[in-house]
């Protein structure tokens, strides 16, 4: 009888250990691959309608600057038209990056804010080390990484 209790205790402890490991891995996975769009959108909504609105318009992004990669130093003057980024010849910003897809990402203006969205690329688009899964607001000076290329919005 004591042998049976000991075996059941061991099996129960082993099962609890595996449940703990599984929960830790699940939490790590959600932290690493969590979409950041909701948090960024909430921050944008909280600032709308305050005194920062006028300040943001004054310091609105006017340029898209390549800060890392083969095109470092390249600058695009922004208009209200979306900016297509990728290796395709008809992209606004044509990348020679092996890790960029043909149609990799799109920067588009919504109101007075710029948003980046991944267009189903293979290697993903990152906003300040967070993977972009939905359209996410891009603050001025925050790097957007596409492969080995990093771009920023500048006033």
Curated annotation (Swiss-Prot):
Family matches, as Gene3D superfamilies: 2.60.200.20
Keywords, in A-Z order: Cell membrane, Membrane, Phosphoprotein, Transmembrane, Transmembrane helix
In-chain residues carrying the UniProt-annotated modification Phosphothreonine: 36
Gene Ontology CC entries for this record: extracellular region; plasma membrane
Post-translational modification: Phosphorylated by PknB. Dephosphorylated by PstP.
Membrane-crossing residue ranges in chain numbering: 6-28
Topology term for the membrane: Single-pass membrane protein
An MF annotation (GO) of this entry: mRNA binding
Main location: membrane
Subcellular location: Cell membrane
One Pfam family matching this protein: FHA
InterPro entries noted in UniProt: Cell_Proc_Reg/RNA_Proc (IPR050923), FHA_dom (IPR000253), SMAD_FHA_dom_sf (IPR008984)
Tagged with keyword Nucleotide-binding: no
Database matches in PROSITE patterns: FHA_DOMAIN
Claim: Chloroplast is one of the keywords in the record: no
SMART domains, alphabetized: FHA
Limits of the FHA domain: 83-132
Quaternary structure note: Interacts with (phosphorylated) PknB via the FHA domain. Interacts with PapA5 via a phosphoindependent interaction involving N-terminal residues preceding the FHA domain.
Protein name: FHA domain-containing protein FhaB
Source organism of this protein record: Mycobacterium tuberculosis (strain ATCC 25618 / H37Rv)
Gene it is expressed from: fhaB
């Amino acid at each position: 009888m004591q042998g049976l209790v000991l075996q059941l205790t061991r099996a129960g402890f082993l099962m609890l250990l595996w449940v703990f490991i599984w929960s830790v891995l699940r939490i790590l996975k959600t932290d690493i691959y969590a979409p950041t769009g909701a948090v960024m959108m909430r921050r944008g909504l909280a600032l709308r309608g305050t005194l920062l609105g006028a300040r943001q318009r004054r310091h609105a992004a006017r340029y898209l600057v390549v800060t890392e990669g083969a095109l470092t130093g390249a600058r695009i003057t922004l208009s209200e038209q979306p900016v297509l980024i990728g290796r395709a010849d008809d992209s606004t910003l044509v990348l020679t990056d092996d890790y960029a897809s043909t149609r990799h990402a799109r920067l588009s203006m919504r109101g007075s804010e710029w948003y980046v969205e991944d267009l189903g690329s293979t290697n993903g688009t990152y906003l300040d080390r967070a993977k972009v899964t939905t359209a996410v607001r891009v603050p001025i000076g925050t790097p957007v990484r596409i492969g080995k290329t990093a771009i920023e919005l500048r006033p």
